[in-house]
């Protein structure tokens, strides 16, 4: 059986999702504070949070244009992805962070993502290990709480697809606060 090699990560972008949406790479940053469409940020967040797999066009359309009477949601998606790529160009230059592949889009596996949500979740999991000393656990909880800058993607909190994730991270936050008390 032939194994496919893991792609080599060329660059790693730091992504903040807790308390706001920001990307930082090589000292250049981009955040949702700039005046852009919320759908643009939402589609970008969806791609990053689902970076482990190609996302079919149909999934994007069901998620972002469910009852939209748009005459051509496929074209609307392509236009939006073009705008996202243009917005990301100052960060990535020639490296394309978003790839198209057989009716789907995916986050380029050569672009690593360091997400605050992943670090937050990992710290909470480590802190819940009862085999650790109380002091070590409290240090881990403090580190986790310092990462939690607010709810997940607060400007996009009306998005149905985000609600379960937001509830999960907020629940972890409340558990960490309670454990620290």
Model-predicted regions and their roles:
Residues 1-43, 95-105, 150:
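Short boundary/linker motifs that mark transitions into or out of structured domains
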Residues 36-45, 70-91:
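DNA-recognition element of transcription regulators
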Residues 32-33, 49, 69-73, 93, ...:
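Intrinsically disordered, charged and Pro/Gly-enriched terminal/linker segments
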Residues 23, 50-77, 159:
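Positively charged, aromatic-enriched patches within helix-turn-helix-type DNA-binding elements
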Residues 31-64, 84:
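Short amphipathic alpha-helical recognition elements used for nucleic-acid or partner binding
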């Amino acid at each position: 059986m032939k194994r496919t090699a893991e792609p080599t990560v060329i660059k790693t972008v730091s992504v903040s999702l807790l308390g706001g949406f920001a990307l930082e790479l090589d000292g250049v940053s981009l955040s949702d504070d700039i005046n852009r469409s919320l759908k643009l940020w939402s589609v970008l967040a969806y791609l990053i949070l689902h970076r482990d797999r190609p996302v079919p066009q149909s999934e994007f359309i069901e998620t972002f244009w469910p009852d939209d009477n748009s005459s051509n949601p496929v074209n609307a998606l392509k236009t939006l992805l073009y705008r996202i790529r243009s917005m990301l160009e100052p960060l990535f230059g020639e490296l394309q962070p978003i790839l198209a592949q057989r009716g789907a889009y995916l986050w380029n596996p050569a672009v690593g993502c360091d997400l605050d949500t992943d670090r937050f979740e990992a710290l909470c999991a480590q802190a819940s290990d009862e085999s650790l000393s109380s002091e070590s656990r409290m240090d881990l909880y403090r580190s986790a709480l310092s990462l939690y800058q607010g709810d997940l993607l607060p400007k996009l909190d009306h998005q149905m697809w985000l609600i379960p994730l937001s509830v999960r991270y907020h629940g972890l936050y409340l558990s960490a606060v309670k454990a620290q008390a």
